């Protein structure tokens, strides 16, 4: 019967390790992720696109000038000239200091995440372990009775393992989205130079802030699941070993599905909350 226990324990260990990895990822900066090698590449791409962004800045500025000013006399008006000059300066600053802006947004969200974890009194997630009642019941099961237990265990282990990888892939996906936003930022930020195109730059900044805020939603979901994990599903010791195991795995997988579903929908939740 050790094989049944080992299968479930292995699946739960995979889940616990991925959940612990999520906590580390959510508190890690993109600059130090994977030793900082990815960040160095992103910086090179960002610097290369800055030149293109500055060229687009002029294009968007001229296009906005044509769209908003009906004649040369409009441009010569002091208030209009100052407005155009200020818009150009702000747009250029966004391109030149866009990296600092995005890093600042990320640090603010990291502060929010730290406040949530400190307030909840959590720094690491509670581990999900197999109850002793289940271990004792399976150990006392005969050979013939163990056949359905193998089926239940294999299905449960496969399902838990799949959920573990879906969960961690979603969190890694958030990291890669932040890298993509940072690398390509000079292009959409250049749109701030034109009055008719400025919404593109503002939408980009709000969208990046939304990606960062996904981390706060994921942390809250992990905290809620940790509360579930600290009070595991109730095990009916009077039931048969098959019923006991099936009931436990079913309730455990349901709790895991809630967590994985919330993590997968974190982007949608942020958009609904913040109107992004």
Which positions does each model-derived feature cover?
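Alpha-helical transmembrane segments
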Residues: 189-206, 269-273
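Alpha-helical transmembrane spans of integral membrane proteins, capturing the lipid-embedded, hydrophobic core
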Residues: 56, 60, 64, 84, ...
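Alpha-helical membrane-interface segments at transmembrane helix boundaries
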Residues: 42-50, 82-86, 90, 139, ...
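Hydrophobic transmembrane alpha-helix segments characteristic of membrane transport
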Residues: 56-92, 184-198
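Non-cytosolic segments of integral membrane proteins
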Residues: 92-184, 218, 222-275
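Binding/recognition "hotspot" determinant
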Residues: 1-56
């Amino acid at each position: 019967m050790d094989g049944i226990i080992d299968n479930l324990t292995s699946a739960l260990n995979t889940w616990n390790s991925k959940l612990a990895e999520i906590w580390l990822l959510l508190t890690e900066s993109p600059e130090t992720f994977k030793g900082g090698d990815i960040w160095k590449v992103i910086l090179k791409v960002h610097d290369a696109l800055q030149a293109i962004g500055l060229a687009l800045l002029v294009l968007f500025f001229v296009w906005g000038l044509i769209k908003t000013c009906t004649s040369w006399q409009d441009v010569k008006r002091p208030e209009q000239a100052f407005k155009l000059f200020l818009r150009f300066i702000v747009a250029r600053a966004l391109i030149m200091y866009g990296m600092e802006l995005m890093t600042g947004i990320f640090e603010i969200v990291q502060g929010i995440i730290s406040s949530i974890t400190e307030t909840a009194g959590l720094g690491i997630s509670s581990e999900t372990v197999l109850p002793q009642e289940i271990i004792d019941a399976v150990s006392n099961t005969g050979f013939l009775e163990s056949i359905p237990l193998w089926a239940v265990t294999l299905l449960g282990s496969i399902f838990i393992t799949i959920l573990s990888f879906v969960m961690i892939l979603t969190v890694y996906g958030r990291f890669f989205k932040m890298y993509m936003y940072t690398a390509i930022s000079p292009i959409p930020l250049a749109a701030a130079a034109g009055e008719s195109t400025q919404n593109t730059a503002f939408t980009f900044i709000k969208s990046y802030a939304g990606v960062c805020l996904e981390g706060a939603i994921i942390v809250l979901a992990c905290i809620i699941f940790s509360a579930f994990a600290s009070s595991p599903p109730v095990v009916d010791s009077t039931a048969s070993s098959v019923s006991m195991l099936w009931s436990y795995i079913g309730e455990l997988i349901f709790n895991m599905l809630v967590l994985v579903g919330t993590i997968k929908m974190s982007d949608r939740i942020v958009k609904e909350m913040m109107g992004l």
